[in-house]
Every structure is written in C-alpha cells, then in structure tokens.
C-alpha cells in the first residue's frame, strides 16, 4: 500500500499529469532493422543454405536481443511482407522500408536482384542506393561470397553495375565472409588458445 507520503505523492502526480500533454511520458518504439539481399541465392555456395533461411535466422536472432531487459529491435524482411508481384508497387514498397528503417543490413553477394526494366538497376542495388541517400550512417554492408555467374546478359549487366557501385562507395563494410565459415565453437576455441577468452 505504501506510506502516506508515497500515497500523497502518487495522488498528486496523477492529478497534475492526468491528461496534460506537457507531462506525458515519451513512448519508445523498437529500432527498425531491414535486411536487404537476394532471397533464392544460396550461402555459402550453390549447395548451401538459401539466403531466405539465413535472413529468417538473422531476423529471429536480432529480434531476440534485449536492451535493458526489453526487446529493442523489429526486423523487416520481404519474406514476411504482404505478397506483391514484381511491379512498381513492390519496388516502391521495398524502398519505403529502406527509408523507414533505422538500420539497413545489406548482405552483398554481387547479385543486383530483379529489375523493373532490362536496363535498370536491380532491387538490391536500388535498396543500397536508397539507404545511402537516406542516411549513410544506418547502412551496414556484409560482403558474402560472390554469386555464381548467370547466362542472362541483362542480369549480368545489372550485377556488374551493382559491383561497380559498391566498389565506388566507402560505406562501412563488415568484411568478407569466407566460404568455409568456422563455427562459433571453433572461434571460441581459437580465442582461448590465444588467451583471448
């Protein structure tokens, strides 16, 4: 029940702040993260895991992280979005997600993604550009092993434009992820041998 001063303080606070917009508490929202990459490509190679599965696992892992005991992140991946065809509407919807997110994680494997027109840039390329144009500081690029070559000339051209653009930017890069990615246990064992843990 609390002491008399506590009850008076609570009653006074309720009276003073009730309905007063100047004294209302700020409401916090979760940080919005978007993961941009191809979905159907495989990581780390043709026999590896589809990037869709990698993206879902990343989403689950990021959303499980807590800050001061509260879940702090909300992750958007297009696999969980409302189904749209490859039209102007789905293109615009993806770019809107880029503008609205607080952090954009680009999983770069050199594949630019689908395009509205044969000579255009791909959706992954467009998302990367939109992120840099919206706020460079929110973009994080993780370089994966390069995707396999394609016989589609227009797609090859898009991929080459994307690779050239990425090379011209000085965005934060998380490094190149090798094909033979060690397990967390192997990394911890190596760190212990070196006296790091």
Protein language model features and the residues they cover:
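C-terminal interaction surface of TIR/SEFIR-family domains
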Residues: 5-12, 17-23, 27, 147-197
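Conserved N-terminal substructure of TIR/SEFIR domains
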Residues: 12, 17-107, 133-134
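A general structural detector for well-ordered alpha-helical segments in enzyme core domains, enriched
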Residues: 54, 58, 93-97, 124-127, ...
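Short, solvent-exposed coil/turn elements at secondary-structure transition points
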Residues: 81-83, 145, 184
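Conserved short-loop catalytic and cofactor-binding motifs
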Residues: 82, 119, 175
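Hydrophobic/aromatic beta-strand patches that form the interior of the parallel beta-sheet core
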Residues: 105, 139-142, 179
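Amphipathic helical hotspot of TIR/SEFIR-family domains
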Residues: 112-154
């Amino acid at each position: 029940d609390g002491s008399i001063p506590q009850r008076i303080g609570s009653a006074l606070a309720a009276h003073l702040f009730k309905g007063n917009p100047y004294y209302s508490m700020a409401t916090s929202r979760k940080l919005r993260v978007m993961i941009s990459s191809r979905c159907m490509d495989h990581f780390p190679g043709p026999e590896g895991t589809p990037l869709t599965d990698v993206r879902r696992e990343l989403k689950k892992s990021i959303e499980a992280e807590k800050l001061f005991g509260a879940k702090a992140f909300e992750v958007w991946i297009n696999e969980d979005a409302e189904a749209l065809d490859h039209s102007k509407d789905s293109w615009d919807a993806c770019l809107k997600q880029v503008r609205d997110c607080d952090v954009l994680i680009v999983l770069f494997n050199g594949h630019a993604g689908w395009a509205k027109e044969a000579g255009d840039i791909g959706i992954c390329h467009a998302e990367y550009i939109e992120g840099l144009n919206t706020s460079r500081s929110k973009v994080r690029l993780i370089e994966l092993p390069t995707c396999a070559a394609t016989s589609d000339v227009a797609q090859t051209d898009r991929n080459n434009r994307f690779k050239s653009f990425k090379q011209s930017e000085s965005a934060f890069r998380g490094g190149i992820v090798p094909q033979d990615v060690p397990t967390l246990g192997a990394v911890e064992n190596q760190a212990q041998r070196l006296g790091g843990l």
